[in-house]
Amino acid sequence: VVDGDAGVAIDDEASMATIVRFLKSLGHKTLAYIEQPINTTPFVCSDRLRKKGFSEASQACGYADEDIIVMPSLSHIDARSEQDIYSGIVAQLLSAPKQPTAICVSVDAVAAPLLKELRRMGWRVPQDVSLVGFDDDDTATALDLTTMHQDPAEIGRIAARKTLALLNGETLDEPFTVMPTSLVLRGTTERVS
């Protein structure tokens, strides 16, 4: 964001940091972060900010480098199908020197096929590994997925009001608005025993 730009967004970094602190409070020792496929979204900036928030919060919470697994975009995995992609991700997690006790994904859309593949490979969620998404879309509700909630409809309404005001030559009292997010606790996370 350039000073003076008008807009509305969430704080992706702070939101992901909230997720990391939550997982730390549950006693998770090894975290994995799985990026969103680059080719499926115009929101590359949000993905980058969420990854940065994950990395910085992990360090701030005292996680050592060997306790953090960051998986690159799924589009970097050589695969012919979506199942191949998620099989590849789970295989990499299984072969990691330390298997994660919790996995963060950059969007809920990644969590759904990942959850299916984790279960297919014998991992129990949340008993063996916790899983946290981001966005709180319909997928999250259907999967009982713990996730970071944002309100895209409200973001859109505020953006539309700002746009109309600018088109009418008005000066905005608040050019840039940062919208709140909240962690929605559901059935894919639990305290490490």
Spans of features found by a protein language model:
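Bacterial carbohydrate/catabolite-sensing allosteric modules
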Residues: 2-193
